[in-house]
Design a protein with these regions (language model features):
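Acidic-glycine-rich active-site phosphate/pyrophosphate-binding loop
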Residues: 36-42, 95-110, 156-169, 216-218, ...
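Acyl-CoA/ACP chain-elongation machinery
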Residues: 141-160, 212-216
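Short beta-strand segments
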Residues: 9-12, 120, 145-151, 192, ...
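Short coil/turn connectors at secondary-structure junctions
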Residues: 3-4, 80-84, 111-115, 139-145, ...
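Claisen-condensing/thiolase-fold acyl-transfer catalytic domains that form or cleave C-C bonds
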Residues: 62, 66-69, 92-93, 105-106, ...
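Condensing-enzyme catalytic core mediating Claisen C-C bond formation in acyl metabolism
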Residues: 1-57, 166-239, 243, 326, ...
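Short acidic, glycine/serine/threonine-rich loops at helix termini
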Residues: 20, 97-99, 131, 156-161, ...
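Glycine/charged-rich beta-loop-alpha catalytic/anionic-binding loops adjacent to active sites
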Residues: 50, 82-87, 107-119, 168-175, ...
Length: 339
């Protein structure tokens, strides 16, 4: 589906203060790795993740989301009262209810007329949020939409390490928990508006999505534990991505290896990125990587990577950028953006 008048007005991000290296995790897991005869460099070689960041223990995610949202509003050059839609796409939540969006809405002091709600779809949530907010903007619901996402992985990683250190842990337990050890934390926010109101050149051109919910149980997580069949998830995700690429090629303008300047994909790790590149026949050199220093930050990964790429000057005005996400479920979304 194509957008006709949708712009990205601003992006802001916040990185947690605590950096935790893969080497630190490996040291804590050394007895487990020795027992299963797993090389100590296996985690780094398989994931390509050097470090990830965690918030200080107990830091509320709605406060992290509020802080970064406030900066996104300021960068957009608008007043908080102009925000008509607020969507939180966080996997991490401080409470089952109220919604994260309502907490951020209250913290920011937004108007009573501002629609606010949570939208969750695993690691695909932020891209889904852009689509939903974009449709609402183009239908006239509001002039400005604010998307927020605050992710915290410290507690689940810590709980996973504690479980793996138990002498009763099996090799299967280790590999089912392996993906959890790649998780990181971050907060990100984005302001969307009508192209006719925008002060930027950043346009969302359109997006396509496909689902394969026969594979919805390959990654199942709670606040304390995540169990993942990484091999099957990778294979099924790549197959669905190939199908989605075909749909995108037919429905989105300039959607081809030749027409796309940069790929900003969901950031899982090195083996996943390489498999995706090979399956789609795209250039690895065009892929912007954030996982080496941030790990997998869930739905915050794509907007964070986009923000880092624009901040560094890698993505420049006028560049055609492909935003691509794969979320547990399985769901895949591919989105065309002209920066």
């Amino acid at each position: 589906m194509n957008f006709h008048d949708l712009a990205i007005e601003s992006i802001a991000y916040e990185l947690p203060p605590v950096a935790v290296s893969t080497e630190q995790l490996v040291r804590r897991l050394d007895p487990v790795l020795r027992r299963f005869k797993i090389p100590v460099d296996a985690m780094l070689q398989l994931t390509g993740i050097i470090e990830r960041r965690f918030w200080t223990r107990g830091h509320p995610m709605h406060l992290a989301a509020t802080d970064v949202a406030r900066r996104a509003i300021q960068r957009a050059g608008i007043a908080p009262g102009q925000v008509g839609i607020l969507i939180s796409t966080s996997v991490s939540k401080d409470y089952l209810e109220p919604s994260m969006a309502s907490l951020v809405h209250g913290d920011l002091g937004l108007t009573q007329e501002c629609r606010n709600f949570d939208l969750a779809n695993a690691c695909l949530g932020f891209l889904n949020g852009i689509e939903v907010a974009g449709r609402m903007i183009e239908s006239g619901v509001a002039d400005y939409a604010l998307l927020v996402d605050g992710e915290s992985a410290g507690d689940v990683v810590e709980a996973t390490i504690t479980r793996l250190q138990d002498p009763s842990t099996t090799l299967r337990d280790f590999w089912e928990a392996f993906a959890t050890l790649t998780l990181g934390s971050a907060a990100v926010a984005m302001v969307l508006t009508k192209g006719s109101l925008s002060q930027t050149t950043h346009r969302v051109n359109g997006c396509v999505s496909l689902a394969d919910t026969a594979n919805s149980r390959l990654c199942m997580g709670t606040a304390e534990r995540m169990v993942t069949d990484s091999t099957r998830l990778l294979k099924a995700g790549v197959v669905l991505a190939q199908k989605t690429w075909g749909v995108a090629s037919n429905q989105l303008n300039r959607w081809s290896e030749q027409g796309i300047g940069h790929y900003i994909c969901h950031q899982v790790g090195a083996s996943h990125m390489q498999a995706l590149v090979e399956a789609l026949g795209i250039s690895f050199a065009k892929c912007v990587l954030s996982y080496p220093t941030h790990g997998n930050v869930g739905p915050a990964a794509v907007p964070l990577t986009l923000a880092l790429a624009t901040e560094s000057g890698r993505v420049k005005e006028g560049d055609h950028v492909a935003l691509m996400g794969i979320g547990s479920g399985l769901n895949v979304t591919m989105m065309s953006v002209t920066w």
